[in-house]
Swiss-Prot record:
Essential cell division protein. The chain crosses the membrane at residues 31-51. This is Cell division protein FtsQ. It comes from the Bacteria. Keywords: Cell cycle, Cell division, Cell inner membrane, Cell membrane, Membrane, Transmembrane, Transmembrane helix. PROSITE patterns: POTRA. The lineage of its organism: Bacteria, Pseudomonadati, Thermodesulfobacteriota, Desulfuromonadia, Desulfuromonadales. Residues 52-282 are periplasmic. Residues 65-133 form the POTRA domain.
């Protein structure tokens, strides 16, 4: 049968959700301006670097900064010429070419130099300031060496070196090299005892020829006259020296007759003579 009625509306099938894509516009103008500024910045940086390099070359090549004078300060034992020789600074060297730390290290190779500092004074001068070591005592190891106030062993004694310092004996060389704490503590005590003797008027550092160190008995001093042992023990040195000074004027003329002096008895000084013991209150 033929349908002659009005045509049916055809349903349109809708394909899934479609979103209209927005076309992206590239900001060429902005990019071009950014690129231009970047190029200009790089060019400026390049010019700065070039100018700096040129200026650096001019500084190193200029005669204006060549070393003309070297001033040496605070040297007493070591002469100026010896310090200049150690520095190995060639005349006419550009002041900017010098490695000041390396120059200081070369100067410090001398055992008498504790430290050296080098600084520039523009345009053409250097200043070298040194701190020298001062012997406090002589320590007996495999050989005799100078010892400074900080306990640093710094120089083996040679012909012509001064010998008028107290000698510290009883130090184990290997233990000292290894930094043994007990050995370092002993040396420190000996140096502190020398400090207490320094400046005294009755029994002073000039009355002492040697300090013998021992783990068990502590420190024993030996007098310059007669080589009499003075037993000081491990501590309380100041009060012991005070007691000793009260009777030392009486003993000084008889040191050749004394076997030993012991300060380790509380509030007493024991003096052993050949004939027996003389007890002195202090």
């Amino acid at each position: 049968m033929i349908n002659i009625g009005p045509p049916k509306k055809r349903r349109l099938r809708r394909k899934g959700n479609r979103f209209k894509k927005t076309r992206r516009v590239i900001p060429w103008r902005r990019l071009m301006i950014g690129a231009l500024w970047g190029t200009m910045a790089l060019a400026s940086l390049g010019m700065v670097v070039a100018v700096a390099c040129f200026a650096g070359q001019m500084l190193f090549a200029s005669d204006y900064f060549k070393v003309e004078r070297i001033q040496v300060e605070n040297n007493r034992r070591i002469g100026r010429e010896e310090i200049l020789a150690l520095s190995d600074i060639c005349p006419g060297t550009n002041i900017f070419e010098l490695d000041l730390e390396r120059v200081s290290t070369r100067i410090e190779k001398n055992p008498w130099i504790a430290s050296a500092r080098v600084r520039r004074m523009f345009p053409d001068q250097l200043v070298i300031r040194v701190d020298e070591r001062i012997p406090k005592a002589i320590v007996r190891l495999d050989f005799m060496y100078y010892l400074d106030a900080s306990g640093h062993v710094f120089k083996r004694l040679e012909k012509g070196d001064r010998l008028d310092f107290p000698v510290i004996s009883g130090v184990d060389r290997q233990a000292l090299l290894e930094g043994n704490e007990a050995t370092l503590s002993q040396i420190d005590k000996a140096l502190r005892l020398l400090d207490r003797l320094d400046g005294r008027k009755i029994f002073a550092i000039d009355d002492v020829s040697e300090l013998s160190l021992d783990d068990t008995t502590g420190i024993t001093l030996y007098t310059c006259i007669g080589g009499v042992p003075v037993r000081m023990g491990h501590d309380d040195y100041n009060s012991k020296l005070n007691r000793l000074e009260k009777i030392f004027p009486q003993l000084k003329t008889r040191l050749g007759l004394i076997d030993y002096i012991d300060t380790n008895v509380t509030r007493r000084i024991i003096v052993k003579l050949d004939a027996g013991e003389l007890r002195g209150k202090g």
